[in-house]
Amino acid sequence: MGKVIGIDLGTTNSCVAVMDGKNSKVIENAEGMRTTPSIVAISDDGERLVGQPAKRQAVTNPERTFFAVKRLVGRRYDDPMVEKDKKLVPYKIVKASNGDAWVEADGQTYSPSQVSAFILQKMKETAEAHLGQKVDQAVITVPAYFNDAQRQATKDAGKIAGLEVLRIINEPTAAALAYGLDKTKTGTIAVYDLGGGTFDVSILEIGDGVFEVKSTNGDTFLGGEDFDMRLVNYLADEFQKEQGINLRNDKLALQRLKEAAEKAKIELSSTTQTEINLPFITADQSGPKHLTMKLTRAKFEALVDDLVQKTIEPCRKALKDAGLTAGEIGEVVLVGGMTRMPKVQEVVKQLFGKEPHKGVNPDEVVAIGAAIQAGVLQGDVKDVLLLDVTPLSLGIETLGGVFTRIIERNTTIPTKKSQVFSTAEDNQNAVTIRVFQGEREMAADNKILGQFDLMGIPPSPRGMPQIEVTFDIDANGIVNVSAKDKATSKEQQIRIQASGGLSDADIDKMVKDAEANASEDKRRREAVDAKNHADALVHSTEKALAEHGSKVEDSERRAIEDALSDLRESLKSDDAEAIKTKTNTLAQASMKLGEAMYKQQAESDAAKHAAKDDIVDADFTEVDDDKNNKKSA
């Protein structure tokens, strides 16, 4: 069995780790970095860039550079959160035929699962390069507060990337695994996870290798991206006041503002003041305009204070659901890059009444935990039991549009629960089961996961038929629902797939696209390798021809020069096969030149040897003077 890798698929950055003996190890990518920006770009010539190369060109290619796409995963186009994002990002968010939010570049649409798959492919390649073997299984993390549609979309992304997703694991739970694996830590902990796009808090009980999640809460649209946008809006407003130009209308300027905001935010975690300097940010009739501004930590904290405060209520709800007070929490573990912000640490300290634990790397701990879970599934990590929970209540719509819960939030998974319902009208021969997830009392206010019909109910007075509805949640938090008429034993069941979501046909098409892209990437790589090889041969042949060309026949020299000319011409194209053919032709033609060079070398060596043979070794006899000298008395 090959290695199973652990992947933290983040909003801003992603990370991959693997078990190395008894320890989990983060793997560096091709650029030598331990985390990879979760950014995908389409270049002018249609090449797909992922990670750091995509981030580097974002300023000059804002409309075809997709970032923070995780926030769109499993969301509908008309979702209020998507509406909010549409105003803030320079790339196009469009409505797919199934009503989901997708992204578009150059008329080509991509689902968020597909964009996530490009990032997962990069993680897969990073692991394969490190391990020297093919990787096709993974554990992938998601925010604890992700609903069923978002979890399913993440699993789809893994499939598109060519990975069998053995387990979807919650990010705070993964962090707790990494924190508590050494078995010495026991007690109750809170994991406060403020990442690039999402916020989660989980309360866990740890002891004797058992990691039991007591409760979880969060906000899937709150993270570092929101902090960045606050600063972007502030900078744009200040510039408009000074210069009368709205930078939000210029996508290129907006991308530069975003990069500057992210940089300033990071710097203000370790310094109390920073300077934002963006020369030639725009221009008008009077000439170019520059943006220069000093920003203090206090000002930045004031701008984002309400965002930090938004993390408090989920923490209180999680404590309440776990039946605990803040004082009963033994340790608070900080996860996610945003927890480096002093203001965030201060709020956590005030809320829990203790200094938060900073002994884990907030950018890497989730991937490390995912790799540990991969080790558990592979049998490499023993005596670890993970008991997670479902973050939101699950139920169906009943008479009057009421949401009737079948599985309450924070129920340990996997789990299976049933409840018996009946018909609302006389002689009703079919029922529609509408499945929802959420905490509101009316079904319409919650997230609909899907619906199906149970047909063929025998005619009876209302309230007589007994219809048993069963919810089954697997260890990934993904839901299956069945309905059974107890009188006829007729049953209908579905794996919940949101009214949007990707169909199997969509996924198959995207898998094929990904494979085709992998072939295209391979072709490009082969062309580059062939060019490098050809360039080296051209250089060495030209040098040899200049130094030793006189030692071959004129016809042979002309053949070499012709082959050189042909190869130089083929180097102008990207046709790897043509380049390889011309390279072989030149290699064959220049063999005579090589023979002449070796012949000259051999003659030179022979001459040196002959000169050495002319040297006469002198015979000598050693005389022992002591024998010839007599001792005197």
UniProtKB/Swiss-Prot annotation:
Keywords: ATP-binding, Chaperone, Nucleotide-binding, Phosphoprotein, Stress response. The modification Phosphothreonine is found at T198. Residues 616-625 have a biased composition (Acidic residues). Residues 605-615 have a biased composition (Basic and acidic residues). One of its GO terms (molecular function) is ATP-dependent protein folding chaperone. Residues 515-537, 599-633 are annotated as: Disordered. It holds the Pfam family HSP70. Induction: By stress conditions e.g. heat shock. Acts as a chaperone. PANTHER family: HEAT SHOCK PROTEIN 70KDA (PTHR19375). Belongs to the heat shock protein 70 family. This is Chaperone protein DnaK. It comes from Rhodopseudomonas palustris (strain BisB5).
